[in-house]
């Protein structure tokens, strides 16, 4: 028996039929399934960033203080550059076959990548095969994440009542906060319980292995989802991508520039663990603890940003936090560099996480609202994947390189400020989308 689509349920509820109760129930289920899968995938992705110092030494025995770390974060960036391909393939698949099968596929791919990372022996054990396997695993994870955001966000927006789309889609960013927070808890716990030698030997693998336990649950939840977009198998993926590139160039280009600062700010937040240990010389538990705080803050302020975007509109919720971050990031880093301790690190991470969560939420609902339902998943996947690949994917490598070359710990702040200005300019050319009918 086929499940009704959520859009059908929305129509029924608007016409006053008895399915209104089912609509509310389905929406909660859709949020839970999207959040669980998205959190799992981002958890696996950001865990790599958290433990980059240890992973670098395990798989990339490069000489120099920053050598192995730069090799590790470069491999982290490889996953970002696989995102556009994942966005094209899986995003178009979601517009052709439906949101639900695409969301199940992304979980399967992230599982393969995670198993590979968790089980690969070190360079010392199997030589050059080790970094090659790690790079392949990062590519697979990048494909999955590139194709995850478009279908899942499209489903949430299409499932939501018109006046709640911002709040529903905000759970995508909030779920990333959950992933960061859980990763932070594990990082702090492992740092406290294990010695540096144990962390280097096997401890960093534990968080990857733990995530595998949840995968059957997430797949089951997504299998039970109703569909929000009817399959259109007569269209090929090439045709769908062609429509996006031909008819929606403005949204695509401006969206990529809008997401540039989201990618950079998020990755600088993730990079703070390596930055705190390697540059500020703070202890690993303090560094991991700051990430935990950042994850909790992201969860709270993403939901707040969604509520505000529903009340005030997408543009103003996008604009104000961006301006504040652009103006505040350099003074905040000056404070952190001059007084590197728990309070300053936690404060800087909190400000970055809060402001980024708010404008990321507004952007994540605005872009898909500006795209028609027939190509929404593909368009959003391309915007998100290209924006995060070009800018977010290079962030950790660039700032690590800038710090090493300039000998200035202020490099992350100046880089983020510059990218934020570009995103602000792009945002000014995007129209308000709050009142658009997303079922067309």
What residue ranges belong to the model's regions?
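C-terminal ends and interior cores of transmembrane alpha-helices
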Residues: 108-126, 324-339
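Helix-to-loop junctions at the C-terminal end of transmembrane segments
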Residues: 87-98, 302-314
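Extracytoplasmic gate region of multi-pass secondary transporters
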Residues: 49, 249-297, 392-396
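A late C-terminal transmembrane helix in Major Facilitator Superfamily
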Residues: 373-405
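Extracellular/periplasmic helix-loop-helix junction of adjacent transmembrane segments
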Residues: 52-85
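Cytoplasmic membrane-interface "Motif A"-like loop-to-helix N-cap segments
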Residues: 96-108, 311-323
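C-terminal transmembrane helical hairpin of 12-TM major facilitator-type secondary transporters
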Residues: 316-362
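Glycine-rich segments within core transmembrane alpha-helices of 12-TM secondary carriers
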Residues: 167-191, 383-395
């Amino acid at each position: 028996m086929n499940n009704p689509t959520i859009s059908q349920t929305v129509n029924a509820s608007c016409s006053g039929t008895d399915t209104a109760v089912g609509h509310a129930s389905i929406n909660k289920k859709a949020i839970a399934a999207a959040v669980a899968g998205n959190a799992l995938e981002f958890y696996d992705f950001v865990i790599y960033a958290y433990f980059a110092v240890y992973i670098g030494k395990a798989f990339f025995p490069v000489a120099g203080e920053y050598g192995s770390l730069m090799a590790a974060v470069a491999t982290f960036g490889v996953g970002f550059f696989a995102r556009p391909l994942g966005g094209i393939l899986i995003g178009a698949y979601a517009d052709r076959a439906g949101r639900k099968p695409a969301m199940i596929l992304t979980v399967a791919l992230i599982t393969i990548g995670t198993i590979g990372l968790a089980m690969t022996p070190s360079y010392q054990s199997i030589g050059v095969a080790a970094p090659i396997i790690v790079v392949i695993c990062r590519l697979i994870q990048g494909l999955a994440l590139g194709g995850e955001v478009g279908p899942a966000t499209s489903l949430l927006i299409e499932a939501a009542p018109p006046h709640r789309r911002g709040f529903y889609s905000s759970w995508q960013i909030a779920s990333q906060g959950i992933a960061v927070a859980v990763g932070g808890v594990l990082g702090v716990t492992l740092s406290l319980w294990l010695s540096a030698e144990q962390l280097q030997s096997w401890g960093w693998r534990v968080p990857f292995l733990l995530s595998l336990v949840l995968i059957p649950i997430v797949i089951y939840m997504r299998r039970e989802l109703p569909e929000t977009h009817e399959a259109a198998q007569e269209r090929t993926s090439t045709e769908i991508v062609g429509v996006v590139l031909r008819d929606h160039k403005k949204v695509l280009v401006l969206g990529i520039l809008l997401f540039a600062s989201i990618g950079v700010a998020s990755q600088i937040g993730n990079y703070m663990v390596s930055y705190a240990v390697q540059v500020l010389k703070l202890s690993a538990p303090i560094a991991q603890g700051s990430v935990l705080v950042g994850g909790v803050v992201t969860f709270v302020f993403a939901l707040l940003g969604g509520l505000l975007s529903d009340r005030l509109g997408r543009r103003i919720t996008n604009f104000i936090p961006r301006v504040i971050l652009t103006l505040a990031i350099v003074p905040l880093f000056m404070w952190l560099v001059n007084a590197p301790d728990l309070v300053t690190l936690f404060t800087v991470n909190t400000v970055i996480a809060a402001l980024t969560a708010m404008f990321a939420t507004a952007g994540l609902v605005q872009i898909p609202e500006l795209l028609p339902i027939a190509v929404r998943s593909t368009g959003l996947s391309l915007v998100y994947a290209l924006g995060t690949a070009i800018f977010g994917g290079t962030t950790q490598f660039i700032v690590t390189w800038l710090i090493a070359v300039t000998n200035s710990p202020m490099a992350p702040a100046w880089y983020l400020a510059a990218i934020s200005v570009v995103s602000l300019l792009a945002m000014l050319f995007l129209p308000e989308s709050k009142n658009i009918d997303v079922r067309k």
